[in-house]
C-alpha cells in the first residue's frame, strides 16, 4: 500500500489539516492517509486539551472521511515524539508498504534541525505542501539534499523511500492558534472545523476560558 502520514498536535484538528491531506492523497494516488497526533512534541511544551481528547477528535475526522485512518503510535508513547523513531517502528511493522510523510514548507526549511533527520530518507518519501510560486533558496541549509532528491509526483516510481516531492496545494488561511483564540472568546469558527469537531468541542466545553 501507498500510505501518507500527516503528523501534528491537532489542537484541534481542522480543515487546514484535512484539505491539503486530501489533495496530496489524490495527487499521489495514495491508498490511505494516516492522521498521527503527537503526544509530547519536542518543540512544544503543552497542549490545550488532553491527548485522549485530541485522539477522539482525530478519530471523528477519520469516521467522517474514509480516506483517513487514525495512527495513535506517537500519542501512546510516553516519551518525546521524534519522527525517525516513529517511522522505524512503522516500517518495521509494515515492511511492504510505501510511506509518504506530509509536511509544510516551514518544516522542510528546518528539517536539518530534526533528530537524525538524514535517516528519514531511508524510511519514507517526504511530501512538501507547496504554496503557489514557492521555490527553495540556494542559501538554504538543505538545498543540496533537496536538489538531489526532488521529484515531481509523476516521477516517483521504483523507489520506496528517499525522495522529496513538492505538491502545490490550495492555501488554507486557518491555524489552530487562531481557532483556539476564537473559541476562548465564544466565537465558533464554523468555516474552519468539521461539524462533528464543533459538536465535540461544545459537548466537552473545550478551549473556553
Swiss-Prot record:
Keywords linked to the UniProt accession: ATP-binding, NAD, Nucleotide-binding, Nucleotidyltransferase, Pyridine nucleotide biosynthesis, Transferase
Protein's GO biological process: NAD biosynthetic process
Family membership: Belongs to the NadD family.
Superkingdom classification of source: Bacteria
HAMAP family associated with the record: NaMN_adenylyltr
Function text: Catalyzes the reversible adenylation of nicotinate mononucleotide (NaMN) to nicotinic acid adenine dinucleotide (NaAD).
Pfam families listed in its UniProt record: CTP_transf_like
Protein's name in the database: Probable nicotinate-nucleotide adenylyltransferase
Catalytic activity, reaction form: nicotinate beta-D-ribonucleotide + ATP + H(+) = deamido-NAD(+) + diphosphate
An example molecular function term from Gene Ontology annotations: ATP binding
InterPro entries reported for this sequence: Cyt_trans-like (IPR004821), NadD/NMNAT (IPR005248), Rossmann-like_a/b/a_fold (IPR014729)
Enzyme Commission number: 2.7.7.18
PANTHER family membership: NICOTINATE-NUCLEOTIDE ADENYLYLTRANSFERASE-RELATED, PHOSPHOPANTETHEINE ADENYLYLTRANSFERASE
Pathway: Cofactor biosynthesis; NAD(+) biosynthesis; deamido-NAD(+) from nicotinate D-ribonucleotide: step 1/1
Enzyme class: transferase
Amino acid at each position: 500500500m501507498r500510505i501518507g502520514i500527516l503528523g501534528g498536535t491537532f489542537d484541534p484538528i481542522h480543515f487546514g489539516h484535512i484539505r491539503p491531506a486530501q489533495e496530496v492523497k489524490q495527487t499521489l494516488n495514495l491508498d490511505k492517509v494516516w492522521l498521527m497526533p503527537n503526544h509530547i512534541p519536542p518543540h512544544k511544551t503543552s497542549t490545550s486539551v488532553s491527548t485522549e481528547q485530541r485522539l477522539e477528535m482525530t478519530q471523528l475526522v477519520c469516521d467522517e472521511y474514509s480516506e483517513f485512518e487514525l495512527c495513535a503510535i506517537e500519542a501512546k508513547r510516553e516519551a518525546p515524539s521524534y519522527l525517525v523513531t516513529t517511522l522505524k517502528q512503522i516500517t518495521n511493522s509494515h515492511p511492504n508498504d510505501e510511506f509518504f510523510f506530509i509536511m509544510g514548507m516551514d518544516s522542510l526549511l528546518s528539517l536539518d534541525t530534526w533528530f537524525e533527520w538524514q535517516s528519514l530518507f531511508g524510511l519514507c518519501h517526504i511530501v512538501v505542501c507547496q504554496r503557489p510560486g514557492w521555490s527553495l533558496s540556494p542559501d538554504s541549509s538543505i538545498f543540496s539534499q533537496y536538489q538531489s532528491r526532488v521529484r515531481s509526483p509523476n516521477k516517483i516510481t521504483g523507489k520506496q523511500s528517499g525522495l522529496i516531492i513538492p505538491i502545490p496545494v490550495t492555501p488554507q488561511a486557518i491555524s489552530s492558534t487562531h481557532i483556539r483564540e476564537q473559541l476562548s472568546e465564544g466565537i465558533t469558527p464554523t468555516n474552519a472545523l468539521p461539524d462533528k469537531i464543533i459538536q465535540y468541542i461544545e459537548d466537552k466545553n473545550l478551549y473556553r476560558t
